[in-house]
Design a protein with these regions (language model features):
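Exposed low-complexity, polar/acidic, P/S/T/G-rich flexible segments that act as propeptides
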Residues: 355-378
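Carbohydrate-binding surfaces of carbohydrate-active enzymes
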Residues: 1-4, 12-248, 252-254, 258-263, ...
């Protein structure tokens, strides 16, 4: 929203999803899993403070990216890959997890920033279960938890140290594994894939009595024991993907500042008692840039505008095609959406002001004014 511009980290989405599963949920759902673009012709449905049905928030006119795992133009954000681990897990083990009851050994009246104990939950049924650990809280640094003793289904795990920021799921009496300080990811063609949790030594105790300690990740080609494969976090989040690691072709894009901003936007407080977003008429006073589109293959290419400002709008032949509330991240646009004959775009940027009644994340440069840092095609 205009007045509140959070910067979503991969751990934010992942920890929330793990906590939901550990608390008894069986269906992972997302408001936006793939970001979108608002369609033409229904301006009366734009989300603003003047529309109570949309919770009194001023949203961009076109952009509906929502920092979703897959962005507005299909780009993969880091949390797309971290969440894949849960999606694979639920696909292969969801039927086992679904009837398991949730148990909460730690206190449930948790206050924000409470760092006095490790947050975890257990789900179990008929002697099998999972331990869900969350030692992460958004914008609240939690400490490393030492000498942690976990027990589920009557099985005691070895004492471990849980590093700050750790979010993971340990199996108990699942797939021939009595317990493991590693996370189950998937089972395919008789092979069981697990993730080594950074900072936690991997112990795998098998139901046949075999105990493997200090196990190192070996990837998808070499098992650590029989049909058990241990992967590092990157390999686990990219498991079964056939993405070819392409080297991006980056081209700098020429741009020209046509006009300085002629007046500051007079920020008003809307009916919901928060800052109200600029309307169409306010962009008449914005700084104006022209952007020359390079002669290149546009398919799958993104225009990336690194800028500093309050709000930016992008136009093609006088027609609004994209907008952005600045939060420290670049503004993006899919070049394949442009008409073939489009060779130049217009960018209008309303400057930042001192002491704006707007929440900006720490990644944002809130120095008053506006500037284009760099524009590229990638």
């Amino acid at each position: 929203a205009y007045h509140r511009r959070p910067y979503i980290y991969p751990e934010d989405a992942y920890s929330l999803a793990v906590v939901k599963l550990g608390s008894g949920s069986n269906l992972l759902g997302y408001y936006m899993y793939h970001g979108g673009t608002n369609p033409e012709g229904i301006d009366e449905l734009n989300e603003t403070q003047r529309t109570p049905s949309t919770n009194y928030n001023d949203m961009p006119v076109k952009n509906y990216d929502f920092q979703a795992p897959l962005g507005e133009f299909g780009q993969s954000y880091p949390h797309y890959y971290t969440l894949r681990k849960l999606h694979l897990f639920m696909q292969d083990f969801g039927e086992l997890l679904a009837p398991m009851e949730a148990q909460f050994p730690c206190p449930q009246d948790i206050k924000k920033g409470d760092d006095s104990f490790l947050r975890y939950a257990i789900r179990e049924k008929d002697g099998s279960g999972f331990i869900f650990i969350n030692n992460y809280e958004r914008l609240q640094p939690l400490t490393t938890k030492k000498n942690v003793h976990l027990e589920a289904c009557g099985v005691k795990l070895p004492r471990i140290t849980v590093p700050a920021g750790t979010v993971c799921i340990f199996p108990v009496n699942v797939e021939g594994i009595r317990y493991a300080t590693a996370q189950l990811i998937a089972k395919r063609d008789g092979k069981v894939y697990m993730e080594q949790i950074p900072g936690i030594p991997t112990t795998i105790c098998m139901a046949d009595g075999k105990v493997l300690r200090g196990v190192k990740a070996r990837g998808t080609e070499t098992p650590v024991y029989k049909n058990i494969y241990l992967l590092d976090s990157h390999a686990a989040s990219h498991l079964f993907l056939d993405e070819a690691p392409a080297q991006p072709i980056i081209e700098d894009v020429a741009y020209t500042k046509v006009r300085e901003a002629t007046a500051d936007y007079n920020i008003t407080i809307g009916r919901n008692k928060v800052a109200e977003a600029p309307r169409d008429e306010h962009f008449a006073d914005a700084a104006i840039y022209t952007i020359d589109i390079p002669d290149c293959n546009r398919e799958g290419r993104l225009l990336r505008i690194d800028y500093r400002g309050d709000v930016a709008r992008l136009y093609c032949n006088g027609h609004l095609i994209a907008d952005n509330f600045y939060n420290g991240r670049p503004m993006l646009y899919g070049l394949w959406r442009l008409p073939e004959d489009c060779r130049q775009l217009e960018l209008r940027v309303i400057p930042l002001q001192k002491d704006m009644p707007v929440y900006f994340p720490r990644e944002a440069d809130t120095t008053p004014g506006e500037e284009i840092v760099r524009i590229i095609v990638e």
